[in-house]
């Protein structure tokens, strides 16, 4: 008989996204938190995750070891940092445990490693688990097809002052989607700074601007501009709950499909 309940482990359980994920799991039918993993030097190890997060009756002790809890879950959700995620990914690959990756900031070599390990386990990886942002990216593809050749394209993103990578993973994904649609080389068209260039804007370049301030959850705007008009497509995240809802949706999807391996993204989950 097919298993109907989904057991989830969270790496980075007491981070901003981790707490949001725990809250979402607590309120999702047939989905249960069975392991809450934190960094090695956390003072909360062995303390009750329900009491620490004040979410509810979750009688799970906080742990700093993924290996010791490897048999307690079906899927790991990881929103940490590239080094931690890759370490967890290797552990999951050996144990044949599927994983949802929300971490951003991977190098090209690290991304190649993720793709390689997806031959052993099922991986959903997205820079943004918001349904809205993924619909926005889909809309951008059509917009780019129609007006991309005749406009200057700029991507402006804003996040809270604790976010360490810039530009954001989502803005880079947007830029790559635009370049793919236009048959441009992203590595040549992406411009990350102009303060020392002292020259006018070149054709076919995509400019990136990053803002880090306050507690901004996440904002992404794509500007298509020509001499006669400007078109702006914008997505603003009001709450982190949209990311946790999307990540849980991805975990449920991966679990229901029972994939043994493969690298997937939100397009697969949303069928867009």
From Swiss-Prot:
One of its GO terms (molecular function) is oxidoreductase activity, acting on CH or CH2 groups, NAD or NADP as acceptor. It is an enzyme of class 1 (oxidoreductase). (S)-2,3,4,5-tetrahydrodipicolinate binds at residues 160, 169-170. Pathway: Amino-acid biosynthesis; L-lysine biosynthesis via DAP pathway; (S)-tetrahydrodipicolinate from L-aspartate: step 4/4. One of its GO terms (cellular component) is cytosol. The keyword Oxidoreductase applies. NAD(+) binds at residues 12-17, 102-104, 126-129. It catalyses: (S)-2,3,4,5-tetrahydrodipicolinate + NAD(+) + H2O = (2S,4S)-4-hydroxy-2,3,4,5-tetrahydrodipicolinate + NADH + H(+); (S)-2,3,4,5-tetrahydrodipicolinate + NADP(+) + H2O = (2S,4S)-4-hydroxy-2,3,4,5-tetrahydrodipicolinate + NADPH + H(+). Keywords: Amino-acid biosynthesis, Cytoplasm, Diaminopimelate biosynthesis, Lysine biosynthesis, NAD, NADP, Oxidoreductase. Its main location: cytoplasm. SUPFAM superfamilies: Glyceraldehyde-3-phosphate dehydrogenase-like, C-terminal domain (SSF55347), NAD(P)-binding Rossmann-fold domains (SSF51735). The keyword Lyase does not apply. The active site is at residues 159, 163. NADP(+) binds at residue 39. GO terms for biological process: diaminopimelate biosynthetic process; lysine biosynthetic process via diaminopimelate. Pfam families: DapB_C, DapB_N. Its EC number is 1.17.1.8. It is found in: Cytoplasm. Coiled coil: none annotated. Catalyzes the conversion of 4-hydroxy-tetrahydrodipicolinate (HTPA) to tetrahydrodipicolinate. PANTHER family: 4-HYDROXY-TETRAHYDRODIPICOLINATE REDUCTASE 1, CHLOROPLASTIC-RELATED (PTHR20836:SF0), DIHYDRODIPICOLINATE REDUCTASE (PTHR20836). Homotetramer. Belongs to the DapB family. This is 4-hydroxy-tetrahydrodipicolinate reductase.
